[in-house]
Amino acid sequence: MISLMEARNLRKERTGVVLSNKMEKTITVAAKFKEKHPIYGKFVSKTKKYHAHDEKNECNVGDTVRIMETRPLSKTKRWRLVEIIERAK
């Protein structure tokens, strides 16, 4: 059986760029990843958008951030801000 601390460390993490911070305590993060095409075998770049919880409203558009999966916080929010890796210039 997995202990509570081990389960917390198994949560998914993503790194991405903040696209929007216009909502109260919420940011929109675009995470890029590469996926292999099932037929042709070529690696294709894809982007997925996540809504993440930003408790202190500290992110700005263009910041590079790390987000972590969490319990559902609203209809669309299932991620929370862990840290700001790099500020936008």
From Swiss-Prot:
Cellular component GO terms held in the UniProt record: cytosolic small ribosomal subunit
Gene Ontology BP terms: translation
Superkingdom to which the source organism belongs: Bacteria
Classification via Pfam families: Ribosomal_S17
A molecular function (GO) term: structural constituent of ribosome
Entry-linked InterPro entries: NA-bd_OB-fold, Ribosomal_uS17, Ribosomal_uS17_bact/chlr, Ribosomal_uS17_CS
Chain's role: One of the primary rRNA binding proteins, it binds specifically to the 5'-end of 16S ribosomal RNA.
Family to which this protein belongs: Belongs to the universal ribosomal protein uS17 family.
Assembly with partners or alone: Part of the 30S ribosomal subunit.
Protein name stated in the entry: Small ribosomal subunit protein uS17
